[in-house]
Amino acid sequence: MTELRTPTVDLLPGYVDALTRGWTPDHIVGPAAAAEQLATIEADAAGFVARQTNLSAIGDPVTLPDGSKVQRIPGRQYWIWDDGFCGRLSLRWQAGTAALPPHVLGHVGYAVVAWKRRRGHATQAVRLVLPYARAQGLPYVEVTTDPDNLASRKVITANGGVLIEAFTKPAAFGNTPGLRFRIPL
């Protein structure tokens, strides 16, 4: 059964195994993101885990794929789990508003390891995070995907997502086409 787990040091070996097997939590940056995270974990595993939940947006600015830096917003990471690590899901928001800054493409993002795809883990993970998003005061969550990512589109629509726009991603994300969906809460 698919679960969302708060990252802990005890669960970290499953995450590290996925990174060493070629999975990356960031499809835009790719393998460099995995290498960076492995180095961070090796240097300070407990600190890495602690930073996966950042409800107060504390810390250094976030570096975007193009190298530009932006302020953090509140968020938390979950690890998708079903008899081991399956992927990660992130939830981001700003207090008091559903609006997101232009550099944040959606409230929810997820990535499932290749060897556990097509089992419904992403669909269930998104479903499981929606009550937490509602508890943050959000009336809806926005999720974006590439137009050709049919699997992600199915995940979003299975959770009630409605297409609200086709758009061009900001320069920091390559000025590529994207689709923005909204899931009402």
Mark where each language-model region is.
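Conserved acetyl-CoA-binding loop of GNAT-fold acetyltransferases
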Residues: T157-F167
